[in-house]
UniProtKB/Swiss-Prot annotation:
The active site is at D90, D267. It catalyses: 7-aminomethyl-7-carbaguanine + guanosine(34) in tRNA = 7-aminomethyl-7-carbaguanosine(34) in tRNA + guanine. Homodimer. Within each dimer, one monomer is responsible for RNA recognition and catalysis, while the other monomer binds to the replacement base PreQ1. Substrate binds at D90, S91, G92, G93, F94, D144, Q190, G217. GO terms for molecular function: metal ion binding; tRNA-guanosine(34) queuine transglycosylase activity. Zn(2+) binds at C305, C307, C310, H336. Its cofactor is Zn(2+). Residues 248-254, 272-276 are annotated as: RNA binding. It comes from Borreliella burgdorferi (strain ZS7) (Borrelia burgdorferi). Belongs to the queuine tRNA-ribosyltransferase family. This is Queuine tRNA-ribosyltransferase. It holds the Pfam family TGT. The keyword Transferase applies. The gene is tgt. Keywords: Glycosyltransferase, Metal-binding, Queuosine biosynthesis, Transferase, tRNA processing, Zinc.
Length: 375
């Protein structure tokens, strides 16, 4: 299921692959977010051309906006969306818990009010697994509580215990799965920013021996130093035989630091989100295309990029589209940013294989931090 091809000589970075039901996924892996089964503004063909073999979809949104019965009629999410590569589906717990005034937690699950239409629902750990089984998800993520930065120890302890209980019940559900379904369950560790809670959570999750481990509840508004501290601490407790997934990170510097600590998989909607403000990822920093200096700029956004934008259109034209709020501008910018992320990951893999990750990381982060990145 999981194999490591090369470990970096100096750090914990590594290159390898996961064998999943819908094909091989090379690691390190950046996973684009396709909340409803598609990335905003992009055809599946764009991702397929980039050899994207793993996309994240959101159980919360699919359940509430589409309905489980519809997916069941199509015999799974792959048939419904015609995406023939792998899906990782998360529980949507982060979304539920972001509306603290609209939900109530108990030992079995969470009662919540849908913020769009006011309807009431109840998610349980077993129910969330059953939904994702119907989806035919290649990687299933259980229901968990992603707690906020700054809460007190007692609250963090309670949420950590509940998350562990939910993980245990989800694991039991995975042992009674439908015949023929062979998706993998990755369990999530929590603990907020308290090291003893992190350690206990990881040890409890490891006892269940799921195929993969996710580190949840970081990159939630904490200072970067605290993020790195907990990331390193958590990594050291997870066996190297397990694929490691950090949830919700996707900016270049966060990815490079995660790979440095031995993280294999990450996801983030940031590359698509920042295009709404005309922000483009480049090797020279984030380009804010809305600036006046680009109004009459006839050059391409980036010379070495082969996305539709960089092959055909000028900076000035893209600025015009973004300023005019033309959807086509967002589509072009989104495709460019996804191209950039996959190109970056490809360079990182090559650097690890060539024993050059130290130089690559140092030079990239130096340039990154010198530039004016408006995230």
């Amino acid at each position: 299921m999981f194999s490591v091809i090369k470990n970096d000589k100096h750090f914990n970075a590594r290159v390898g692959f996961l064998n999943l039901p819908h094909g091989r996924v090379d690691i390190p892996c950046f996973m684009p977010v396709g909340t409803l089964g598609a990335m905003k503004g992009l055809k599946h063909a764009v991702l397929e051309k980039l050899e994207c073999n793993l996309m994240l979809a959101n159980t919360y949104h699919l359940y509430l906006r589409l309905g489980i019965k519809t997916v069941e009629k199509y015999v799974g999410l792959h048939n419904f969306t015609t995406w023939n590569k792998n899906f990782l589906t998360d529980s949507g717990g982060f979304r539920v818990f972001s509306f603290s005034d609209l939900r109530k937690i108990d030992l079995k699950g969470v009662h919540f009010k849908f913020h769009i239409d006011g309807s009431y629902h109840y998610f349980t750990s077993e129910g969330i697994f059953a939904m994702q089984e119907i989806f035919g998800s290649d990687i299933i993520m259980p229901l968990d509580i992603c707690s906020s930065y700054g809460i007190d120890y007692n609250e963090a302890n309670l949420y950590t215990n509940i998350t562990t209980n939910w993980a245990s019940s989800t694991f039991k559900s995975s042992k009674n799965r439908k015949e023929g379904y062979n998706g993998l369950l990755f369990l999530i560790t929590q603990g907020n920013f308290f090291k003893d809670l992190r350690k206990r959570s990881i040890n409890d999750i490891l006892e269940l021996d799921s195929p993969g481990i996710a580190i949840g509840g970081i990159s939630v508004g904490e200072p970067r130093e605290k993020y790195l501290e907990i990331l390193e601490y958590s990594f050291l407790l997870i066996p190297k035989e397990k694929p490691r997934y950090v949830m919700g990170i996707g900016t270049p510097h966060y990815i490079l630091n995660a790979i440095y600590y031995g993280i294999d998989i990450f996801d983030c909607f940031n590359p698509a989100r920042i295009t709404r403000h005309g922000s483009l990822l480049t090797d020279n920093g984030i380009m804010c295309i809305g600036r006046k200096e680009y109004k009459d700029d006839t050059s391409k956004v980036e010379k070495n990029c082969i996305c539709t934008l960089c092959k055909r259109y000028s900076r000035g034209y893209l600025r015009h589209l973004i300023k005019s709020k033309e959807l086509f501008g967002i589509v072009l910018a989104s495709e460019h940013n996804i191209h950039y992320m996959f190109r970056l990951i490809s360079k990182i893999r090559a650097a690890i294989l060539n024993d050059d990750f130290l130089n690559f990381r140092t030079s990239y982060l130096k340039k990154y931090e010198e530039e004016n990145f408006d995230e």
